[in-house]
């Protein structure tokens, strides 16, 4: 597959073979249901849920690679692929923002994005506590300035934001970071710009290693990635995150969890640790999954931004998109794979019962 101009598409559709049939059927599917697909598409910057039918045809280019990418091997097999890469900037500085109150989060994220950070990450107070507990001797002395700063600004932060700014020179990267910090001064929150790559590394280490700390340091519990990739519009974060935390609160004695992710996108990764040998604890998973995904959908988000559906999220696609759009996913599967050979029970045909039957119990 490759992007096709309109005249190339017409040529493909004239083919009297399986490939020609795919192009004819998919063209009819997306053009006849264009309004439905447009309305169903979540208003977020990343979305891996379902089939990306809305990306195939823009009126000028017909591109089935955008459908095949992210289809989890359910439509066929990729034997060769070509990637376009970019050359990263040589220098970077990190703007670190400590939030004691989530109320201004939406405005802070929006204001930071106007300065075009290269990356914009975050982690919550649970992540920071975990790092302080298990990485204390590695980083304790390096965090003395931050400890003093946050103590003066109301104590332990609820959320830490990491905005990375890059440039072709050290001075360019530093100027971008300082300009952004100056632009955020009105929010009256603790923040600082890293002095060097080594200074920034302690923050990245917490973001990067939090999952490994959970897995290796907390005994008797296993990872349970059932709501590990949610995304909502960034402008709703101030309201969404407190509601999300409230859903987990009743189960705080049955799980350990952290929330980290990409603040600029509103994309968060939650991977609880739970004692999966307990039937009572296992019963929490479908109940909490239902509640979290209902909340995400209510805020106009997606149940998966990056990690895709698999057997865990496929049963929730009708809830997210509605029966009509889900029927188009089923039709797409039949067009490409009429015998249901490729990776069944993903994207379509999955049930909660099937997913739960594959849950670890030890």
Regions found by a protein language model. Give the residues of each.
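Short, amphipathic alpha-helical segments
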Residues: 47, 234, 238, 286, ...
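Amphipathic alpha-helical segments in well-structured domains
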Residues: 177, 285-289, 325-329
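C-terminal substrate-recognition/cap domain of FAD-linked oxidoreductases
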Residues: 55-61, 65-284, 293-295, 299-300, ...
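FAD-binding subdomain of flavoenzyme oxidoreductases
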Residues: 1-114, 339-349, 353-362
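Short acidic/histidine-rich active-site segments
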Residues: 302-309, 344-345
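Residue-level signal for pocket-adjacent positions within structured domains
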Residues: 32, 48-51, 198, 225, ...
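Activity-critical C-terminal alpha-helical subdomain
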Residues: 214-221, 315-362
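Hydrophobic, well-ordered secondary-structure elements that form the walls
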Residues: 270, 307, 337
């Amino acid at each position: 597959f490759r992007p096709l101009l309109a005249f190339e598409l017409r040529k493909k559709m004239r083919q009297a073979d399986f490939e020609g049939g795919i192009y004819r059927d998919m063209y009819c599917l997306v053009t006849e249901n264009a309004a439905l697909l447009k309305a169903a598409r979540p208003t977020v910057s990343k979305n891996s849920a379902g089939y990306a039918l809305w990306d195939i045809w823009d009126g000028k280019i017909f591109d089935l690679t955008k459908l095949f990418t992210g289809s989890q091997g359910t439509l066929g097999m990729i034997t060769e692929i070509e990637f376009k890469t970019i050359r990263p900037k040589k220098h970077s500085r990190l703007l670190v923002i400590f939030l004691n109150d989530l109320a201004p989060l939406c405005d802070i994220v929006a204001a930071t994005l106007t300065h075009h950070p290269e990356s914009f990450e975050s982690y919550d107070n649970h992540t920071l506590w975990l790092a302080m507990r298990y990485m204390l001797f590695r980083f304790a002395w390096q965090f003395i300035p931050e400890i003093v700063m946050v103590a003066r600004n109301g104590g332990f932060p609820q959320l830490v934001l990491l905005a990375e700014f890059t440039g072709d020179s050290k001075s360019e990267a530093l100027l971008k970071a300082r300009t952004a910090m100056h632009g955020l001064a009105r929010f009256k929150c603790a923040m600082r710009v890293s002095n060097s790559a080594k200074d920034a590394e302690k923050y990245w280490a917490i973001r990067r290693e939090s999952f490994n700390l959970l897995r290796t340091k907390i005994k008797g519990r296993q990872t349970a990635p059932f709501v590990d990739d949610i995304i909502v519009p960034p402008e709703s974060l101030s309201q969404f995150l407190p509601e999300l935390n409230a859903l987990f609160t009743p189960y705080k004695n049955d799980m350990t969890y952290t929330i980290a992710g990409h603040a600029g996108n509103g994309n968060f990764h939650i991977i609880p640790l739970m004692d999966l040998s307990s039937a009572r604890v296992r019963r929490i998973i479908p109940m909490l999954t239902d509640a979290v995904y209902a909340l995400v959908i209510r805020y106009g988000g997606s149940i998966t931004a990056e990690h895709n559906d698999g057997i865990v999220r496929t049963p929730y696609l009708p809830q997210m998109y509605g029966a009509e759009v889900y029927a188009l996913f089923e039709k797409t599967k039949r067009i490409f794979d009429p015998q249901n050979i490729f990776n069944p029970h993903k994207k379509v045909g999955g049930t909660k019962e099937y997913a739960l039957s594959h849950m670890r119990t030890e």
